[in-house]
Swiss-Prot record:
Protein name (database record): Oocyte zinc finger protein XlCOF6.1
Keyword Nucleus: yes
Gene Ontology annotations for the cellular component aspect, listed alphabetically: nucleus
Keywords for the protein's UniProt record, in alphabetical order: DNA-binding, Metal-binding, Nucleus, Repeat, Transcription, Transcription regulation, Zinc, Zinc-finger
Function per UniProt: May be involved in transcriptional regulation.
Principal subcellular localization: nucleus
Database matches in InterPro entries: Znf_C2H2-type (IPR050758), Znf_C2H2_sf (IPR036236), Znf_C2H2_type (IPR013087)
Residue spans, zinc finger C2H2-type: 6-28, 34-56, 62-84, 90-112, 118-140, 146-168, 174-196, 202-224
Length: 224
């Protein structure tokens, strides 16, 4: 009953159902048979089309049990949950630094290779990621494409808008696993955690004194 009767003429992979073979063959042909009636975009798989259509409908069926934030797809929820758990499963083979996302690790590894494949046509500055180049380019154009629907203030980066909107909503999605205190920004949580660990990562190049906060180091440097 487990015999696989339908084989791919390109790679030889076998399938029990003809429909499975048909879907698989699209990975070779590049055929995109599923069409979004809203925007005209095509997809290889029906599941990809359904996921895409949520952007049009606003449906976000995947909810974080920690903070209630909702997501269009399950993989984004899993990435978000790592912000609460602190899980960083992807480690750099060069320096050991760990990351929650593989894409962030891959971008980080270019620091070691020195590769900066995306360069600004205005000033020639190079960037590791294309999105960093796009953000940088707005410093030349002055474009601020992300407006706040509450107050109208505009931002050059989507993350700046997300952080700003928390000043309206009061949302604090980043919780300390030690004491439960919540923060609006992940960087504030990271800073807070140093109080539990006693870690002081900012050291004075003049005298070697260490500090838990960069602002404390900067204030200290003025004494030299």
């Amino acid at each position: 009953s487990n015999e696989k009767l339908f084989s791919c003429s390109v790679c030889g992979k076998c399938f029990a159902l003809k429909t499975e073979l048909t879907i698989h063959c699209r990975s070779h042909s590049g055929e995109k048979a599923f069409h979004c009636t809203e925007c005209g975009k095509y997809f290889q798989h029906r599941s990809n089309l359904r996921r895409h259509q949520r952007y049009h409908t606003g449906d976000k069926p995947f909810t974080c049990f920690e903070c209630g934030t909702c997501f269009v797809n399950y993989s984004w929820l899993m990435l978000h949950i790592r912000m609460h758990t602190g899980e960083r499963p992807f480690s750099c083979s060069e320096c050991g630094k760990r990351f929650a996302r593989r894409s962030v690790l891959e971008a980080h590894q270019k620091i070691h290779t020195g590769e900066r494949p995306f360069s600004c046509s205005e000033c020639g500055k190079g960037f590791i990621k294309q999105c960093d180049l796009a953000r940088h380019y707005r410093t030349h154009t002055g474009e601020k494409p992300f407006p706040c629907p509450e107050c109208g203030k505009c931002f050059t980066q989507s993350m700046q808008l997300i952080r700003h909107r928390r000043t309206h909503t009061g949302e604090k999605p980043f919780a300390c696993s030690e004491c439960g205190k919540c923060f609006a920004q992940n960087s504030h949580l990271t800073q807070h955690r140093l109080g539990h660990t006693g870690e002081k990562p900012f050291s004075c190049s003049e005298c070697g004194k260490c500090f838990s906060r960069r602002s404390h180091l900067i204030a200290h440097l003025k004494s030299h």
